[in-house]
Amino acid sequence: MKKLYFLLFLSISITFVFAQCNDRYEAEIFNSVTVTEVNYSDNLQDSYHKMDIYTPDGDTEINRPIILYMHGGSFYGGTKVMTDCVDFCTSMAKRGYVTASLNYRLSTVWDFLASQEEQYVTVLKAVADAKSAIRYFRKDFANGDTYGVDPNTIFIGGYSAGGVIALHLAYIDNLSDLPTSPINVQNLVSNIGGDLEGDAGNYGYSSEVQGVISFAGGLNDVSWIDANDEPLVSIQGSNDITVNYYCGPGTNNPLVLDLCGSGEMHPRADNVGILNDHLNFSGTDHAWAASGNSNSKFIDALEFTTDFLYPLLPCNNTTDINDISSNKKLIKIIDILGREIKKQNNTPLFCIYDDGSVEQKIIIK
């Protein structure tokens, strides 16, 4: 395979990525941000569908990548203004991103713990809400572009339950992925509009994302990660049993459906060949992200995420809403010798996509 990549290099034109990026998306280059609250659903008008959009003050750039971030709370608590949400969105907006922290539909603790069917429905509704929020930005782009975004570069992430939502949004590709036994989850989708796009509106626009950020999140079934899927970056403590680092019941409660964390997701991602990276906080439990910037591990997670996302960015190339392609995904970054690498400055990078195309870039710093 490395020989094949090397032969491909002979016919590849070089893209020099001067930063228009220029420290954007890496360092906090803006001093402050503006937060705008919107209702992101065009057919559900309630507090569950409120979203705070963070934009850097004084920024004249347009065509900016987006990160949507979702709060934790075990699917029966939490809001968009929790400390980690505010700190994550503020920090990434100061780096030049447009970021958003969103509410989503919740259950009650009694209903959620009483029935695994309710747990499936609650997660599916939350995924539907997040998909609507993604479509909100693409719809806005097509109708005036209020926020100056690149609709081709949208990342989804969150902490705990928020990470669970992001992972299920990205990696459940088809209704047939969902189990039919012992609970027929495919039939439960009728509760959220009849298909995976859900019932929260903004229809007619893509809900695809270009990467997933998981802070202590997990998947119910890691086999949903396949070779055509989005890049994954995750950060988790190895002693996490709230969302088990390997696999176990959510919140360590036998009444709750199993979740499989970073210890299972990344071997799967490696096996199927999607771009991924993981920061393991050895000996750490679940709560490291909850206090935001006051915990040094949260700062480390922000920097790790920033470094992972940076090579995925188009750095302000022109974009058209009709150019969105959910079929071309970055699967590997290698150097001139064919070795898989992370982002490096002043060094040729070769980005390998799942459609067989290769792009060479040099990030000039």
What name fits each language-model region?
Residues Q20-I62:
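N-terminal cap/lid segment of alpha/beta-hydrolase-fold proteins
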Residues G58-I62, S115-A128, S132-Y159, L175-P179:
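Gly/Ser-rich "nucleophile elbow"/oxyanion-hole loop immediately N-terminal to the catalytic nucleophile
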Residues N63-G73:
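Short beta-strand element of the alpha/beta-hydrolase
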Residues F75-D84, N103-L124, A287-N293:
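Cap/lid segment of the alpha/beta-hydrolase catalytic domain
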Residues V81-L102:
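Short amphipathic alpha-helix adjacent to the substrate-entry channel of hydrolases
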Residues A93, E230, I235-S282:
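Active-site-adjacent alpha-helix of alpha/beta-hydrolase-fold enzymes
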Residues G263-N317:
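C-terminal catalytic histidine-bearing segment of alpha/beta-hydrolase fold enzymes
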Residues P311-E340:
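Residue-level detector of functionally pivotal "anchor" positions at catalytic/ligand-binding pockets or at interdomain
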